[in-house]
Amino acid sequence: MTHCCSPCCQPTCCRTTCWKPTTVTTCSSTPCCQPSCCVSSCCQPCCRPTCCQNTCCQPICVTSCCQPSCCSTPCCQPTCCGQTSCGSSCGQSSSCAPVYCRRTCYHPTTVCLPGCLNQSCGSNCCQPCCRPACCETTCCRTTCFQPTCVSSCCQPSCC
């Protein structure tokens, strides 16, 4: 508890595979940390060990907590991450395209959600550059389902 955060925080979130890789490794089966005391030094309550690992859809350690939708999808597992399509191995349809759901999406420190489907591009996937409000050079780098870079802002039609 002393290495986690304030006393109101339970240590179950404070894993090396959760949120920050430098967090303490001792854990228990108690409920997860509350955001009121753990948002800065512990894993956020949405983090789950099966999702918030350094292999979760990224080849490097995550710098932000996984969202519930990320933790609930099979594509968040290491068996799927990095593939151009998920298929049956991830329990997703062939339209799953984590090829553009990577750390380079919009902001380098953003944890992009895996298993992005065509219907969800620009909403809960990591493709905010497909929104007219995000017309910045650093934002528009990858078109939907294509690993090629673009130099101009993405249009809604790219999704």
Swiss-Prot record:
Function noted in UniProt: In the hair cortex, hair keratin intermediate filaments are embedded in an interfilamentous matrix, consisting of hair keratin-associated proteins (KRTAP), which are essential for the formation of a rigid and resistant hair shaft through their extensive disulfide bond cross-linking with abundant cysteine residues of hair keratins. The matrix proteins include the high-sulfur and high-glycine-tyrosine keratins.
Cysteines engaged in disulfide bonds, as pairs: none
Cellular component terms per the entry's GO annotation: cytosol; keratin filament
Keyword Repeat: yes
Signal sequence, renumbered to the chain: none
Alphabetical list of Pfam families matching this protein: Keratin_B2_2
InterPro entries: KAP
Family designation: Belongs to the KRTAP type 9 family.
Chain positions covered by the region annotation 15 X 5 AA repeats of C-C-[RQVSGE]-[SPSNQ]-[TASPI]: 8-157
Alphabetical UniProt keywords: Keratin, Repeat
Quaternary structure note: Interacts with hair keratins.
Sequence repeats: 8-12, 13-17, 32-36, 37-41, 46-50, 51-55, 56-60, 65-69, 70-74, 75-79, 80-84, 129-133, 134-138, 139-142, 153-157
Name under which the protein is recorded: Keratin-associated protein 9-8
